[in-house]
């Protein structure tokens, strides 16, 4: 009989329907109910991208697509995917409990975010481990980051180069690549959190493989907590770069994300485009990985390497 291994795929989660918005937002705010104004603001942003975020369907397609890719590529073990979300059901704890009930003794966990941070990935891993400890299993081997995977870097480079083909050859010199990820509170730097450096490394690796001659690092989608967050924000960065260099084309590459969701469809496609329109430059963004076969191959390689080692 083929050995069964759990595949715990963890992600942020998103409201499934309009009625979920309040409890979802309350969970993000550690149980503090948001004001009517905050809910209206979030509703407005979802409305601007054409309704609720497609993230739930994409996460599902990524998890089960990864399960299939792993099982199709070898017959040593059978992987079974379980989705665990941070802010809405099925919660991380629900997924661990389902694995335990199914008699899974060993699992590999991966967070659908390439960079490690104590604030994000570590928090997911901690919840999974605590849930497993409480139940007496399964044993979870956590993948902390996977931004260095050569197939991941190549995937983004290919997408950027494809996008650059839309730019007239004589304007390529006036083009800049903006590489970004979700901002986090600046206090993470006090604890030598590797997150900012990992984004820098990702940008450097990608830049070596693209035809675009300039790049800059930015942060986006910061929370409204009143404390300082990592910067520069991508919108401020766009204005600053245009003011200094008069770039004609901006290619936004939110490599910290793996799907087309609110932070990309609104914070990039709407908010950043407002700025490029304002300064008279062109806005470009390569397609997100979503559940594309080349991205599933990235994840498959990462999980299989973890399992094999």
From Swiss-Prot:
Lineage, top ranks: Bacteria, Bacillati, Bacillota, Bacilli, Bacillales
Signal peptide: none
Subunit text: Monomer.
Protein's UniProt name: Coproporphyrin III ferrochelatase
PANTHER family xref list: FERROCHELATASE, FERROCHELATASE, MITOCHONDRIAL
Enzyme category, top tier: lyase
Principal location class: cytoplasm
Role, per record: Involved in coproporphyrin-dependent heme b biosynthesis. Catalyzes the insertion of ferrous iron into coproporphyrin III to form Fe-coproporphyrin III.
Residues binding Fe-coproporphyrin III, per UniProt: 12, 14, 29, 45-46, 53, 124
Compartment list: Cytoplasm
Highest taxon listed in the record's lineage: Bacteria
Pfam families (UniProt xref): Ferrochelatase
Keyword presence, Transferase: no
EC number: 4.99.1.9
HAMAP family with a match to the protein in the record: Ferrochelatase
A GO CC term assigned to this protein in UniProt: cytoplasm
InterPro entries reported for this sequence: Ferrochelatase (IPR001015), Ferrochelatase_AS (IPR019772), Ferrochelatase_C (IPR033644), Ferrochelatase_N (IPR033659)
GO biological process, one term: heme biosynthetic process
């Amino acid at each position: 009989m083929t050995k069964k291994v759990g595949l715990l795929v963890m992600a942020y989660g998103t409201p499934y329907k309009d009625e979920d918005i309040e409890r979802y937002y309350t969970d993000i705010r550690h149980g503090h109910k948001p004001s009517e104004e905050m809910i209206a603001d979030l509703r407005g942003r979802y409305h601007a991208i054409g309704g609720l975020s497609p993230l739930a369907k994409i996460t599902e397609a990524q998890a089960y697509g990864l399960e299939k890719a792993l099982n199709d590529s070898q017959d040593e073990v059978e992987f079974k995917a379980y989705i665990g979300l941070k802010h809405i059901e099925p919660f991380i704890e629900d997924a661990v409990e389902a694995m335990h009930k199914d008699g899974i003794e060993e699992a590999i966990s991966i967070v659908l975010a390439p960079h490690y941070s104590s604030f994000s990935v570590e928090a997911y891993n901690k919840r999974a481990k605590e849930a497993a400890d409480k139940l007496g299993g399964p044993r979870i081997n956590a993948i902390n980051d996977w931004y260095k995977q050569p197939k991941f870097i190549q995937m983004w480079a290919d997408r950027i180069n494809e996008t650059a083909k839309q730019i007239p050859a004589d304007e390529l010199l006036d083009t800049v690549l903006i590489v970004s990820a979700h901002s986090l509170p600046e206090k993470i730097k006090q604890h030598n959190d590797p997150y900012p450096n990992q984004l820098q490394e990702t940008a450097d690796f990608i830049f070596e493989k693209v035809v675009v001659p300039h790049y800059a690092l930015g942060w986006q989608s910061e929370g409204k907590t009143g404390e300082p967050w990592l910067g520069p924000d991508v919108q401020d960065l766009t204005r600053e770069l245009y003011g200094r260099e008069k770039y004609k084309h901006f290619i936004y590459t939110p490599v910290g994300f793996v799907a087309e969701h609110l932070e990309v469809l609104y914070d990039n496609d709407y908010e950043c485009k407002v700025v490029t329109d304002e300064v008279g430059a062109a806005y470009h963004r390569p397609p997100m990985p979503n559940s594309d076969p080349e991205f599933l191959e990235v994840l498959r390689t990462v999980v299989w390497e973890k399992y094999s080692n």
